[in-house]
Amino acid sequence: VNASDRTPADLLRSALTTDPARPLVTFYDDATGERVELSVATFANWASKTANLLQGDLAAAPGDRLALLLPAHWQTAVWLLACSSVGVCVEIGGDPADADVVVSGPAPDDLAAARACRGERLALALRPLGGRFPQAPDGFADYAVEVPGQGDRFAPFAPVDPDAPALAVAGTELTAAQVVERARADAKALGLTAPGARLLSARPYDSWEGLSAGLFAPLAAGSSVVLCRNMDQLSAQGLAKRIESERVTGTAQGDTVS
């Protein structure tokens, strides 16, 4: 990790330079049995394609605001880094009526709320392997249809300002530099200090604590996250087995860290 990195996108670029093959995000959904592992290189490729979609097809520019109506998921993590790459401010669970772009998951309530956005509207099916909707929701482009053809490399049209708003979550707005600063501090508190550290996080993405444990702190520390959704459906025995098989070195569940 480079000390001069001042945005999450900078952190990802540094990781890609130093250790592209290491796992960055390993995602489990215990409601569906899905497991997806993304190396730094694979994750960065998804982020680049998504940033090209955001900057090109969706015409997003630095300073624009994107309402993100998605749960803790590997594709949500990709969107967070894509927005950082373009300089778009992500509002977690933000009001679509006030946003320039809205990105929604498949939940009917989220799609209904997202229709209030007067700008571009994109929907994610959140199906295994990044699958598409059988039919895209009315008024939305399907992310899984739009993203594969995007370029594998991304260059922003304008430089990203580390001191511009980058993330709004649970009533707090942070600049890109503040996200990086907080993530670095959290990495130490979460025990992400040794090489090869792997944090299992079952926290939702609706708070800074969830976003940090589930993405930003492991990224800042040069470690990796095992991101678990619907883990209440996993038995204690199943969790113990996962911790062993994934070589987990620490866990973040609710307010507890171990």
Model-found features: residue ranges?
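Long terminal accessory regions outside catalytic cores
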Residues: V1-P8, D29-G33, A41-T42, A72-Q75
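Conserved AMP-binding/adenylate-forming
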Residues: L53-G93, P195-F216
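ANL superfamily adenylate-forming
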Residues: V101-L190, E244-R247, T251-S258
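A short N-terminal helical cap/helix-turn-helix that marks the beginning
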Residues: N2-T26, F157-A158
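Conserved AMP-binding/adenylation subdomain of ANL enzymes
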Residues: A183-R198, Y205-A252
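Flexible, charged surface loops at secondary-structure boundaries
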Residues: T17-D19, A59-A61, G94-D100, A114-R118, ...
